């Protein structure tokens, strides 16, 4: 099940720098990662990607601990419909749920997961509305939650997301790395890029990074 309408364009480097400037004016520490530094010797001008990390940026809009506790107490989807096997299976890599402007009970047989109305949760609603004050680019966004219930065992492999162009993420709970690895013509290039994320951090990807 896909929620919302995919954006025509993702974020660009100018927008990321503008967001960085807005947060830094409010005394938040930011770091803009140039993911293409790892392949600069290959002269791949069209392969420029960036990700902006705002340390503890959630704090500007809402209390990270309250959000973590709220999320921790929700009912998460632990099952999904496997398209290849055509049956409902248990989730092993992570649990999921979504937030939108309506509620939905899961119906795994019909490929539908749990959706909560974000306005029912004050701490999340404040975060969502707070981001909107930074520009129209943050309007009409859908929200997906990924619960890595055991960070020593959980996780997903390297992938790109064709299903979305705008990516704004928040980290809650234990620190966890976000890793990138460049691929070109089906081959892995150079070194892994590791971006550390801590409780309360916000990260924003440009379109290529997503």
Predicted segments, located by residue:
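Non-heme Fe(II) oxygenase metal-center motifs and adjacent flexible, charged/small-residue loops
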Residues: 1-210
């Amino acid at each position: 099940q896909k929620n919302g309408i995919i954006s025509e364009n993702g974020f660009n480097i100018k927008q990321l720098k503008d967001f960085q400037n807005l947060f830094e004016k409010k005394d938040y520490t930011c770091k803009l990662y140039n993911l293409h530094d790892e392949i600069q010797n290959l002269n791949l001008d069209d392969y420029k990607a960036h990700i902006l990390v705002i340390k503890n940026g959630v704090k500007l809009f809402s209390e990270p601990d309250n959000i973590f506790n709220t999320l921790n107490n929700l009912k998460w989807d632990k099952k999904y419909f496997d398209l290849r096997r055509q049956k409902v299976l248990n989730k092993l890599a992570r649990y999921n749920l979504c937030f939108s402007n309506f509620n939905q009970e899961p119906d795994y047989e019909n490929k539908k997961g749990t959706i909560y109305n974000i306005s029912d949760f004050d701490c999340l609603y404040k975060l969502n509305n707070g981001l909107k004050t930074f520009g129209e680019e943050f309007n009409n966004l859908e929200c997906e939650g990924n619960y890595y219930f055991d960070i020593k065992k959980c996780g997903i492999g390297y992938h790109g997301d064709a299903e979305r162009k705008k990516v704004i993420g928040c980290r809650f709970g234990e620190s966890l790395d976000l890793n990138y690895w460049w691929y070109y013509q089906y081959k892995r290039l150079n070194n892994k890029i590791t971006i550390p994320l801590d409780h309360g951090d916000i990260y924003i990807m440009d379109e290529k990074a997503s």
